[in-house]
Amino acid sequence: YCGSNLNFESLGHIVERSKIGEKKEIILSIAIDEKKGSFRKLCRDIGQKNITEFSYRKDGSSNAKILLGLELQDSKKSKDTFLKGLKNKKYSFIDLSNDEISKKHLKFMHGGRGPQLESEFVEEVYSVDFPEKPGALLNFLTLLKDKWDISLFHYKNQGAIYGGALVGFTIRQKQVKSLERDLLRISYPFTRETENLGYQAFLK
C-alpha cells in the first residue's frame, strides 16, 4: 500500500527509475554534426521508438551532443539490435543506462547557456506541446524542412496526452514573424518564452 505522503512527482520518479532498472529505457549520449538536417536525420534513424527524453543545446562546437532517452521492448536483444543499428549508421554514442550519476543528475544538468551571438542574431524560445505518440518529433522537424537553426531543444515524456518541449531557434531579428508563421502551420500549440525568467537566468 502506498502511503499518502507519496506525491505524483515522487511516483513519476519511481516509475522512471524502474523502467531503466527493467531495461525498458536506455539513456544515450550521442554525437551528431552541428549542421542543419542532422537533428532530423537522427530522429528518422531512431524510427518509431518511444522517445522519453531528448535534450540538446548548441554550444558553438562542430559536434552536438544529444542526451537521448528511449523506451524499448523489455529485452536485451532489443537494445543490442538498436545500438548495432546506430553503429552501422556511423553514430558515435555512449550508453549511460547503467550510470548512476547520469540517471540522477546529468539529465537535469545537460544544456547551459548558448554561444555568444553576432549582433544581428537572436535566440527565440518557445514551449511546444507535442502529441505523446511515436513520430511526433520527426513530424515537427520534417515540417520545418531544415529551414531554421535549432539551438536549444528539451523534451520530456510526462505520460500525458501532450508532452512539453522547449525549443530555441537562432534567427535574424527580422525573421521572428516568418518563424511563427511556420510554427502555426505545424498545428502544435506553442507559446513564446524568450522573456521567461528561468530561460534568461540559466540558458541565454
Label every model-predicted segment.
Residues L6-K204:
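A conserved regulatory-domain signal marking ACT and ACT-like small-molecule sensing domains
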